């Protein structure tokens, strides 16, 4: 599903990735391990279009994406949950989830793109679309209404699925995101990413700053998402034990270079991995 081939990426003069190659098969969980500064987050930023590679190529479902904008990449079905969560702390849980659904339910026609450029809210975009279709006659207006109703049903289905994974978010749907606990904020960040109904989920350090019991719960849910939906997941994580426990395959990054690549089972048995990342 996802292939990186000899990807080199940099921040100004500082090269962060040196010829990185990796594959993420459809339906799998692949983890990238490494210390701080190894290039793990940079790898995800390159995939999601936040950092354009200097060299190499990135393909998603056979299509090159390394020259696409982040917005275009999101529209293909790639959702990036960044390190640090980056929630809208002044908005409620439900409002954050609605923003997560933006890319999927905003509409893909020219009128929808115009409405997005104008910065209209979701209800405003729907109204804009209906006005546009009305100019084409009653038949187009009826089609616009049907499309709106279908989008609404799809949105409600996505929201229900997120609340099924994270019941605490349903209980706190009207609570301001900035007042949630760290674990609840991480759940909200993942839920917001799921609202776009992605085919590939990029997870950057989901355990960061969380208590061990909360971390285990987060990883249990990540595994459930993969198993129940068949969702493909690329996971960047410092907690190698938990990451390898749910992953099918893993890569180890050191100073921007892949130094190990194997099945998660073999990596758990690898003495170098045990010494460096598993505390053995």
What is the role of each PLM region?
Residues 1-280:
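Glycine-rich phosphate-binding loops of nucleotide-dependent enzymes
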């Amino acid at each position: 599903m996802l292939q990186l081939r000899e990807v080199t990426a940099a921040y100004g003069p500082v090269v962060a990735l040196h010829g990185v190659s990796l594959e993420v098969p459809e339906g799998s969980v692949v983890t990238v391990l490494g210390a701080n500064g190894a290039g793990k987050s940079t790898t995800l930023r390159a995939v999601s279009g936040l950092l354009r590679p200097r060299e190499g190529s990135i393909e998603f479902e056979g299509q090159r994406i390394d020259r696409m904008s982040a917005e275009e990449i999101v529209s293909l079905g790639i959702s990036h949950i960044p390190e640090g969560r980056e929630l809208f702390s002044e908005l409620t849980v439900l409002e954050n989830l609605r923003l997560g659904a933006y890319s999927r339910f905003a509409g893909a026609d020219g009128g929808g793109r115009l409405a997005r450029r104008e910065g209209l809210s979701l209800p405003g975009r729907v109204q804009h679309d209906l006005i546009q279709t009305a100019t084409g006659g009653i038949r187009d207006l009826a089609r616009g209404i049907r499309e709106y109703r279908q989008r609404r049903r799809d949105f409600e289905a996505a929201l229900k699925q997120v609340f099924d994974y994270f019941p605490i978010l349903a209980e706190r749907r009207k609570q301001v995101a900035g007042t949630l606990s760290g674990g609840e904020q991480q759940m909200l960040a993942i839920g917001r990413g799921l609202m776009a109904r992605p085919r590939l989920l990029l997870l950057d350090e989901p355990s960061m700053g969380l208590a061990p019991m909360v971390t285990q719960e987060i990883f249990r849910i990540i595994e459930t998402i993969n198993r129940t939906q068949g969702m493909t997941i690329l996971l960047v994580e410092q907690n190698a034990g938990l990451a390898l426990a749910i992953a099918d395959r893993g890569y180890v990054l050191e100073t921007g270079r892949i130094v190990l690549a194997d099945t998660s089972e073999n990596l758990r048995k690898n003495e170098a991995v045990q010494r460096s990342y598993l505390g053995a």
